[in-house]
Amino acid sequence: MIFLALGATEAIGASSHFLKIEDTGIILDAGADPEQDGPASIPEFDLIRKNPGWYVDHAIITHAHHDHMGALPLLIKSFPHVLVHMTRATRDLADLLLPASARLQRRKLKEGSAAFDPLFSEEELEAYSYLYMTHELEEEFDLSGVRSRVPVKGMFYNAGHVLGAAGVLLSSANGSRVFYTSDTSLRPQAIIPGGDYPDEPVDVLILESTLGADEEAE
């Protein structure tokens, strides 16, 4: 198993991680940094291409915040065969928010407040949408890679963060289990219940740590 953070290790923004499990390559989120513009705002997807034995089969988008999905079009440009998995609510929000991001980038360039061309267009987003696959919470779905001889499955769990947000459990037929919480909260909100997590133990836990060193949060 290989884990590589592609962005947002010490700051909020550009959350994205590469996980290689049983020869299946999976991207966990593809966020953009809201404090940056142009290429500096996206994760370092080139780190994957520099390794000939690595391949991106699937991507998981845990929720529709810019710092977790804003670079999804760039990920698809880099790896055109990737299948993108998310909840239905995240898909519905992505269909609204990503085109809005494309329009904002175009407007900032026109107004002279951006030094870079837009990273993607609304037309590109429409072309990429056939790669989106939606799943219900606690519904098992296939994540096996084209080079893997060992099946890998995924399952979403309510993350308790925003509408549609989900953590994901990754399980291989060899018995290894990885859980990625993404942004999560145990406490219920006005319209969002608190997060749910797998009952059985996992081998690897990838846990968000926002406010993790805050005394009040502890």
For each feature predicted by the language model, list its residue ranges.
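Short acidic-hydrophobic, aromatic-tinged amphipathic segments that line or gate anion-handling sites
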Residues: S129-D142
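Cap/insert and terminal regions of metallo-dependent hydrolase folds
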Residues: G167, S185-E218
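Beta-strand-turn-beta hairpins that frame and shape the catalytic cleft
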Residues: M1-F3, I21-G25, E140-M155, S172-V178
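Short beta-strand scaffold segments in enzyme catalytic cores
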Residues: A14-L19, A165-L170
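A generic structural signal for alpha->beta connector loops
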Residues: H81, Y128-L131, P151-K153, G175
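A short catalytic or substrate-binding loop motif that flags glycine-/basic-rich loops and adjacent residues
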Residues: T9-G13, S148, A159-L163
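Pre-active-site segment of Zn-dependent metallo-hydrolases
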Residues: T9-A14, I21-V82, M86-D92, L97-Y128, ...
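Active-site-proximal beta-strand elements of phosphoester/diester hydrolases
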Residues: I2-G7, I26-D29, K153-A159, R177-D183, ...
